[in-house]
Amino acid sequence: MPVTAMCLQDSKKLKKAKLTRKKVTPFPFSRMVLCLSLVFTLYVEATNARCLRPRSKELLCGSELVDILQFICGPTGFYVSKGASFRNRNRPGIVEECCFCGCSVAILESYCAAPVTNFTGREEQKS
């Protein structure tokens, strides 16, 4: 077999090999929009899912939250737990409860500090 015939046969084999490759089709824009909208919807639903009970109408955030806590707790004051990492908390923080989900007076009262007691067990009066 002559060399030119071998080269022609090899080139035909290469052309066939090139033709058998799968073509990568571009991802259609409509599918990309659909996927992104699904991801966004899942994100929104996940953020709403952190409210385990139905949302109340009143959302309290920032200075409004502090003012209402001072009003409800009175002279005993209030506390916000510190140092607990997000994963180790057994209950959401006051901001998650009242600012994102809305909270009731009972939840606000649960953040009031306990009255200061002296060693006789009687409640001290603050002036």
Swiss-Prot record:
Region (A): 93-113
Disulfide bonds: 61-99, 73-112, 98-103
Keyword Amino-acid biosynthesis: no
Compartments where found: Secreted
Pfam families documented for this protein: Insulin (PF00049)
A molecular function (GO) term: hormone activity
Biological process, per Gene Ontology: generation of neurons; positive regulation of activated T cell proliferation; positive regulation of insulin receptor signaling pathway; positive regulation of MAPK cascade; positive regulation of transcription by RNA polymerase II; positive regulation of vascular endothelial cell proliferation; regulation of muscle cell differentiation
Propeptide position ranges: 122-127
Signal peptide interval: 1-49
Keywords from the named record: Developmental protein, Differentiation, Disulfide bond, Growth factor, Neurogenesis, Secreted, Signal
SMART domains: IlGF
GO cellular component, one term: extracellular space
Thylakoid among keywords: no
SUPFAM superfamilies found in the cross-reference section: Insulin-like
Region of interest called C, as start-end residue ranges on this chain: 81-92
Family: Belongs to the insulin family.
Name of the protein in its database record: Insulin-like growth factor 3.L
Gene: igf3.L
